């Protein structure tokens, strides 16, 4: 059995801790024979290979008495880069328990459990459902709206250095004034409504007008400004920080993708440029 979970790009500008999209990088969990102890085969650095692996810790939170197995973990989702690497493991752990214990969990049940573990739904929701998901987690209740993402190219610049979420959250203000919060919320509303209406020109302007987190976090990612300027000159809809960063995401018309990829590569920044597509499946069992 294989469990396949997509990468995710959260926030998308002003949709802070609420909006995310599933993208075409993947975590694959392959389950083999039963064993006396959990064995996790992988080639990831600083990741446990036993029951202390986040995958197994998550699965055991769902079903304590799971029979251990030998498992192979393969991922092309880079760690601590703002592409939902930990969220993909959490969702995979929930699905592992669901499959091994025959729990028949609904997608909404998986979402609630994943959100309780992760603390917010912006990454785990699209990892479960695929597509674009707008969600909330208030008073221990999670709500999610799944919709298609308008046709566009995602060009990701993934730096060669990590940025831990705890570090990127540390630069955020502890509070926001009422008038500013109203304005920031209005911008987020327009961004989401424009995406759902398929108006990427209007969505792009709202995405780049975020007031919740990007003005503070962009300072941690030196590549952001040159990428944004280059992408804008070539007709991109928007440039935003994926999740907490440091990955910089360019949202562009399909016919501008090649030019943007070439231009970003010619900047010779410390990282790699990737073409990504929206994943429409979410959790996949093979």
Swiss-Prot record:
Molecular function per GO: ATP binding; homoserine kinase activity
Compartments it resides in: Cytoplasm
Keywords: Amino-acid biosynthesis, ATP-binding, Cytoplasm, Kinase, Nucleotide-binding, Threonine biosynthesis, Transferase
Tagged with keyword Ribosomal protein: no
Chief place where the protein resides: cytoplasm
Reaction(s) catalysed (UniProt annotation): L-homoserine + ATP = O-phospho-L-homoserine + ADP + H(+)
Signal peptide coordinates: none
GO-annotated biological processes: threonine biosynthetic process
Record: residues binding ATP: 78-88
One GO CC term, this protein: cytoplasm
Keyword Transmembrane helix: no
Family to which the UniProt record says this protein belongs: Belongs to the GHMP kinase family. Homoserine kinase subfamily.
Classification via PANTHER family: HOMOSERINE KINASE (PTHR20861:SF1), HOMOSERINE/4-DIPHOSPHOCYTIDYL-2-C-METHYL-D-ERYTHRITOL KINASE (PTHR20861)
Its job: Catalyzes the ATP-dependent phosphorylation of L-homoserine to L-homoserine phosphate.
Protein name: Homoserine kinase
Organism of derivation: Streptococcus suis (strain 05ZYH33)
């Amino acid at each position: 059995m294989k469990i396949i979970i997509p990468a995710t790009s959260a926030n998308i500008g002003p949709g802070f801790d609420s909006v995310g999209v599933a993208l075409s990088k993947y975590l694959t969990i392959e389950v083999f024979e039963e064993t006396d102890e959990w064995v996790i085969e992988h080639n990831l650095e600083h990741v446990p290979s036993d029951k202390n692996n986040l995958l197994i810790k998550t699965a055991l939170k769902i079903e304590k008495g799971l029979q251990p197995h030998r498992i192979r973990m393969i991922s092309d989702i880079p760690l601590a880069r703002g592409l939902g690497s930990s969220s993909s493991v959490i969702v995979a752990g929930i699905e592992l328990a669901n499959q091994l214990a025959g729990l028949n969990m609904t997608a909404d049940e998986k979402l609630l459990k994943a959100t309780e573990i992760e603390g917010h739904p912006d990454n785990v929701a699209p990892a479960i459902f695929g597509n674009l998901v707008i969600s909330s987690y208030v008073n221990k209740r999670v709500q999610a709206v799944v919709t298609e993402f308008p046709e566009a190219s995602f060009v990701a610049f993934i730096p060669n250095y990590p940025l831990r979420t705890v570090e990127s959250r540390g630069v955020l203000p502890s509070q926001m004034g009422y008038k500013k919060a109203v304005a920031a919320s209005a911008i987020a509303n327009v961004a989401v409504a424009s995406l759902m209406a398929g108006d990427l020109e209007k969505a792009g302007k709202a995405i780049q007008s975020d007031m919740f987190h990007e003005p503070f976090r962009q300072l941690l990612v030196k590549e952001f400004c040159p990428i944004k300027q280059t992408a804008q000159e070539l007709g991109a809809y928007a440039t935003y920080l994926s999740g907490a960063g440091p990955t910089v995401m360019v949202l562009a018309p399909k016919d501008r993708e090649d030019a943007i990829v070439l231009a970003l590569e010619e900047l010779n920044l410390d990282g790699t440029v990737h073409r990504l597509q929206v994943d429409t499946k979410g959790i996949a069992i093979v």
